[in-house]
């Protein structure tokens, strides 16, 4: 039956045969796409995944090494329907026929990704992702609205972070389904309710991690438009850092996780104290600068007030009156001296003529003229004194000091004269100035 001589036999070792089989499989069949169900899934401590791919008639062992499986957003579990791209191979030490998986995605995820890219392109063309449509976060946030599941881990993470950073901030929850067929409509309705109530400063819209199908409600077009039309600023917080949704592109700010969203919208107590300290220092500096400016203005106004004070004006008027009186007196004295000299000259001439009657007549005339001149001089002096007295009386009449001396007072508010009761209000501090001092009082 076995006629071949030993010399003509091509004898393999087991390892060589397995190696040859592996080479043939890898070179002849190469890479394949496979639709199957996950079974016997094991995640090794090395980071590699080992599982079985099966359908209702057959199964094949599979391995997905760490470098490839780190690209998978959601770890598969028993019973998951998946689509894989793999290389057919043999594990030589045991001769196990297996697949080396390079890419794995939930079955149907490819279609979802194509829908995602198409909607993303359409909404971008309509301007929903433009930076000019995004609102800035408020400077001061005291109330935060959260649109998410009331029982999900995302809400717990958000509340934990807010309690740690700023326990005083108020949180209003808008319970919403965040997975399933009705989720997108509920998310839109919650955003609409939050805007109608207008009871928060900002909204966090999101949920925890999951598969592409789990997060799909945040890729719906109606959710994108609800976020776009929101008057309240919205921070998206969907899944993990690697999860990107349409809601992230439309939102005013994207946070990689719900916890990160809480960090972004809350101000820690240390930050608040630092900000308040900086504001206090700026206020103190500005107040000192303002007080210095007001002090300089007060000094300037005081100097100007002293220049135009009625007392100084009266002194100047009195000095001018004294100068005028001196000039009048000097003028009258000069005229009298000249008249006397004229009389003396005439008397001398008359005495030289010697007629006694003429001399007597001239003497009488001299006496009469002298008397008239004296009377005229006296009347002139009296009239000047009377005018001076009238001028002094008039100055005393118009002087505020004279008014104060008669029992009156002048009321000031903020260094300005109060001219009417309409200038005063309850609580105003006023100053009443009298002839001998001043008092301060408060208007009741």
UniProtKB/Swiss-Prot annotation:
CDD domains: ExoVII_LU_OBF (cd04489)
Domain of life of the organism encoding this protein: Bacteria
Gene Ontology CC: one annotated term: exodeoxyribonuclease VII complex
Keyword vocabulary terms for this entry: Cytoplasm, Exonuclease, Hydrolase, Nuclease
GO molecular function: exodeoxyribonuclease VII activity; nucleic acid binding
Swiss-Prot/TrEMBL catalytic activity: Exonucleolytic cleavage in either 5'- to 3'- or 3'- to 5'-direction to yield nucleoside 5'-phosphates
GO biological process per UniProt: DNA catabolic process
Record's subcellular location: Cytoplasm
Cited NCBIfam families: xseA
Function: Bidirectionally degrades single-stranded DNA into large acid-insoluble oligonucleotides, which are then degraded further into small acid-soluble oligonucleotides.
The protein's name in its UniProt record: Exodeoxyribonuclease 7 large subunit
Species this chain originates from: Pseudoalteromonas atlantica (strain T6c / ATCC BAA-1087)
């Amino acid at each position: 039956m076995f006629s071949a001589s030993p010399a003509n036999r091509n004898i393999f070792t087991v390892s060589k045969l397995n190696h040859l089989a592996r080479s043939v499989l890898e070179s002849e069949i190469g890479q394949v796409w496979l639709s199957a169900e996950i079974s016997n899934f094991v995640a090794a401590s090395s980071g590699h995944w080992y599982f079985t791919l099966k359908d209702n008639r057959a199964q094949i062992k599979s391995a997905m090494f760490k470098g490839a499986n780190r690209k998978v957003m959601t770890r598969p579990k028993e019973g998951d329907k998946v689509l894989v791209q793999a290389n057919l191979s043999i594990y030589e030490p045991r001769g196990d026929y297996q697949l080396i998986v390079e890419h794995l995605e939930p079955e149907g995820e490819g279609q979802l990704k194509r829908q995602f890219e198409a909607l993303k392109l359409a909404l971008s063309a309509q301007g929903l992702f433009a930076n000019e449509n995004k609102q800035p976060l408020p400077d001061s946030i005291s109330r935060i609205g959260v649109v998410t599941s009331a029982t999900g881990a995302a809400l717990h993470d958000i509340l934990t972070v807010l309690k740690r950073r700023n326990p005083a901030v108020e949180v209003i929850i808008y319970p919403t389904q965040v997975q399933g067929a009705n989720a997108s409509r509920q998310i839109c309705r919650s955003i609409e309710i939050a805007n109608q109530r207008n009871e928060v400063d900002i909204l966090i819209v999101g949920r925890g991690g999951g598969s592409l199908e789990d997060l799909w409600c945040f890729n719906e077009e109606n959710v994108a438009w609800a976020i776009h039309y929101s008057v309240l600023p919205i921070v998206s917080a969907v899944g993990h850092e690697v999860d990107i949704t349409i809601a992230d592109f439309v939102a005013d700010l994207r946070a990689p996780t719900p916890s990160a969203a809480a960090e972004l919208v809350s101000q820690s107590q240390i930050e608040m104290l630092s900000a308040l300290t900086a504001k206090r220092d700026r206020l103190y500096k500005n107040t000192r600068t303002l007080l210095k400016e007001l002090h300089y203005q007060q000094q300037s106004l005081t100097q100007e007030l002293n220049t135009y004070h009625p007392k100084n004006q009266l002194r100047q008027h009195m000095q001018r009156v004294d100068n005028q009186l001196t000039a009048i007196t000097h003028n009258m004295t000069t005229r009298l001296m000249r008249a006397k000299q004229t009389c003396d000259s005439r008397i001398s001439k008359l005495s030289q003529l010697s007629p006694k009657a003429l001399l007597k007549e001239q003497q009488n005339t001299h006496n009469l003229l002298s008397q008239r001149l004296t009377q005229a001089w006296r009347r002139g002096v009296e009239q000047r004194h009377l005018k001076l007295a009238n001028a002094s009386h008039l100055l005393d009449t118009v002087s505020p000091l004279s008014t104060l001396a008669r029992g009156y007072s002048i009321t000031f508010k903020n260094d300005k004269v109060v001219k009417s009761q309409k200038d005063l209000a309850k609580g105003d501090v006023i100053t009443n100035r009298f002839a001998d001092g001043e008092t301060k009082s408060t208007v009741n």
